[in-house]
């Protein structure tokens, strides 16, 4: 019996690509090596139909091509070739106006193009039953595969570091400013506990660019972002009560916007900035704290998660 050949087209090389596309299919092939052969291609040649015709299943996340305008039509071509197309979707197609990429999504009508992909795909996989119910209004062939990890992966096996302090942490991405704002005022309440507690802000990142849109022409220009402009700087202001919970020398070091060569210098301080790490090791940061916070606003985009 010949193996079923599966082509996986991840959306990125970070968290979504790893946990929604790459890891599940590596697991599939390892568990059923006699039944499935999996190839992972981040940049498949869209013009070579002979290449795509080698596969019985094509799995993609959100869009099969970086060019959203071509995605729906290409999925329909694959369908006509008898290839089973599976679209994975982990986020609601239209974030709120608070989301940093909302203006770009609206300008380029990306939400409409994602919906078109949902309708075109033979099957859709998603993360929650709530989201599946929403997707089923446009494609009845929807299946829930909850977000999951491999508990045997080394980064998830780190023992919690011992401490005589109560350590609270937040580990996440750059689109959660209005969720983190729920913690405003926390710093004020922690003033009397800063000697026997710590807060770890994990994922700190000053890389990236600012996209500026000309309101009159719609023209977009990009420039490198300045450290103090990043959302991470805003997160830090909220967590530290505008740096009132750190002494002046520590604040001076923080404002250099660099990782400390000697991490022990401020290791006993209430606030701990933990810089971003690769997707293969970032979860090790959970070993640094005892309580993980996940504040989240109640709106359509977040409810689907």
Model-flagged regions — what are they?
Residues 1-65, 212-214:
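N-terminal pre-catalytic "stem/leader" segment of glycosyltransferase-like enzymes
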Residues 12-27, 150-156, 161-280:
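Conserved catalytic-core segment of nucleotide-activated headgroup transferases in glycan assembly
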Residues 55, 121, 289:
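An anion/phosphate-binding loop that grips the pyrophosphate of nucleotide cofactors and donors
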Residues 61-80, 171, 180-183:
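An aromatic- and histidine-rich active-site surface loop
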Residues 74-80, 104-123:
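Membrane-proximal helix-turn-helix segments that form the acceptor-binding/catalytic region
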Residues 86-111, 152, 164, 218-221, ...:
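Acceptor-binding helix/loop patch of EC 2.4 sugar-transfer enzymes
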Residues 119-156:
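Donor nucleotide-sugar binding/catalytic pocket of nucleotide-sugar-dependent glycosyltransferases
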Residues 175, 276-305:
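Nucleotide-sugar-dependent
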